[in-house]
Amino acid sequence: MSALSTLRHTFVYIMLFVALSWPVQAYALSIGEERLIGQKILYSVRKDLRILDDPDINQYINRLGSQVLQVVGPQYFDYRFFVVQSDQFNAFAAPAGLVFFYSGLIEAMRKEDELVSVLAHEIGHVTSRHLAQRMDKGTKVSAASLLLGLAGLALGVPGLSQGLFTGSLAAGQTINLRYSREDEEQADRLSFGWMQEMQRNPESMQDMLRTMRRITRYRMGNVPQYLLTHPNPEARLDYVESLLELHSQQSSAWTKTDNFDFLRFRYRVLVQTTDLDRLRQYCAITLAQDKDADTQRMARFGLALIDAQNRRFDQALEQLALVQGQYPDRNILRVDQAVILQMAGRFNEAKAILDASVHRDPTDMYGLFKLAQVEAASGNTTRAEVLLQQVARAMPEYPQVFFELGQIEANRGASGKGMFYLGKYYLYQGQEDLAVQNLRRARRDTSVPKHMQEEAEQILAELEHINKET
């Protein structure tokens, strides 16, 4: 064994001993307080950032999170995972199990294990309650101040309220909330162990940290060190490389991940968040030069999405047909085909494909939602409503499903029910004033069913409580 390897092994053993010897932390936040702050932060994020509220993207990232949580074990919080439009290379965990990934980070990834490594790292911060530990036990810090501090960590995100950022500096919370080196090492150590349990390749942690180091070096001149949510990637990289050396004999147990779902998810994100001409150029280069078969094939999928966005539907369908030929058993590609047909106004063809696809996989909320839209556009509003209610039960914070339900009720002349659904749409879009306005009207409308009036009252009370407490 080399002297460097011996030194790294010794370092890891020392750090593990120190970690086990750390005293139990005193938390400034109770579980209930953390949940309340999480609710407020989510409302604020919806207001100031653009969350990709797409059932396809949402379902993938949350399924992946659930896979990690299965090995993590019981938790205090119900975790939720979101993709936010931003070219920043970042992800952050907020209180109460809210985890946000920037589209710029996803763009830099090349395989699913890299996404899992970051996802597990953020879960490590939440399950260790690092934010609660960062609080000063002797000082009463409001949820609003904590919110400002978290907002300050999201430096450089287009659309982030300048008032929030300025306030976070004035409140002095940004420095207090910075993760320590020990926090980062604990999150990396937990992530490493969970990936091993999942038989995922933890070398992906090393790959992501190398990318982070390169990007941090490039951007360091513009971003103060104390504002980085994950400081010092060099030290983290050394620590993870030490763990990899320590467990190198277990590398044969790591399974090769099928990256189809990840690559499809990645292109679905990028086509909504990046310049299409630049993305087309990237896809063309990948198609011509990449040696990995899946990466090369799915670059054509990216080209199909770009053509569809540019309303070149025939070319999009031709590109997608080539991808389907490479993956004949992937039902989700049939849904993608139907969506392009729907965009082209070919509703009968889209409906036939979506009916068959949903029958094969009734858990696919993306397919269900698109089928509901096709049914509504074809005048079959009764079935559309049934399908939309299924989606609403599975994804109760997806704004567009309530917009579609509101449209159906408004077209029927049921204005009260339409206002109720419109209120929920605005609520999950982050437009609180409009949400309150419509929910109050629905609550007072005697034509609105009692259970809807009660739900409107409950939402209004919850909003009042959150605003009062924070």
Give residue ranges: language-model regions:
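Extracytoplasmic and endomembrane cell-envelope/extracellular-matrix remodeling and assembly machinery
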Residues: 27, 39, 51-53, 59, ...
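Membrane-active amphipathic alpha-helices enriched in small hydrophobic residues
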Residues: 140-158, 163-175
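Acidic/histidine metal-binding catalytic segments
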Residues: 57-58, 77-80, 135-144, 162-164, ...
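Short pre-active-site segment immediately N-terminal to the catalytic Zn-binding motif
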Residues: 103-117, 179-182
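Catalytic Zn2+-binding segment of zinc metalloproteases
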Residues: 113, 123-140
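Hydrophobic or amphipathic, alpha-helical segments that drive membrane association/targeting
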Residues: 2-92, 173, 215-220, 282-283, ...
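Short alpha-helical catalytic segment bearing the HExxH-like zincin motif
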Residues: 100, 114-122, 126, 166
